[in-house]
Amino acid sequence: MAKLYFNYSTMNAGKSTVLLQASHNYRERGMQTYLMTAAIDGRAGTGRIASRIGIGAEADIFTPRDDVFAMIRDRLGAGPVACVFVDEAQFLSPEQVWQLARVVDDLDVPVLAYGLRVDFQGKLFPGSATLLALADEMREVRTICKCGRKATMVIRQDASGRAITEGAQVQIGGNETYVSLCRKHWREATGDPGAKGH
């Protein structure tokens, strides 16, 4: 029985590396996979999933307007797919997450989604919130803070390395823009949002 999986973490934990390795494992055994990634994230080039350690693969892109169920159903028309992999899943709309659930439930194809859990303000992305609600299984891909603790948060920083606490939820960037931290160091860097107004 197929399942919807959500593999989540903060920035620079190796989500894309894990996705690419899992897809490779299927393909090595003669099974086809279908890779998708968000059109908004062009850091590796449009329609490409790449990891910081240098591996990559071509992928179909989705925009917020796309019907991902239809995209996957159409791909299945070209031949069997053992598993669907979705990178940058935080950029899925809630409706698209429901469409992925339909792929699992109606087409009996496993879907493994990989994405960020929270943004730089500590808020859930809408796609991630819906994945947390609907996924059959969730797995945390771990990375570490500068202090050695598990990093669960991310800060956005300016060119001088100062934390930015306001702005649009989505701003594409890499190591120069975002830093993964434990909650304690995130609170210190952002001015402890929980203490505001007290």
UniProtKB/Swiss-Prot annotation:
- Active site, per annotation: E88
Q: What is its EC number?
A: 2.7.1.21
Q: Which Pfam families match?
A: TK
Respond yes or no to whether keyword Cytoplasm is given for this record: yes
Q: Which UniProt keywords apply?
A: ATP-binding, Cytoplasm, DNA synthesis, Kinase, Metal-binding, Nucleotide-binding, Transferase, Zinc
- Cite a single GO MF annotation: thymidine kinase activity
Top enzyme class of this protein? transferase
GO terms for biological process, alphabetical: DNA biosynthetic process; thymidine metabolic process
Q: Which residues bind ATP?
A: S9, T10, M11, N12, A13, G14, K15, S16, D87, E88, A89, Q90
State the GO CC annotations: cytosol
Q: Which PANTHER family match?
A: THYMIDINE KINASE, THYMIDINE KINASE, CYTOSOLIC
Similarity field: Belongs to the thymidine kinase family.
Full protein name: Thymidine kinase
Q: Which organism is it from?
A: Ruegeria pomeroyi (strain ATCC 700808 / DSM 15171 / DSS-3) (Silicibacter pomeroyi)
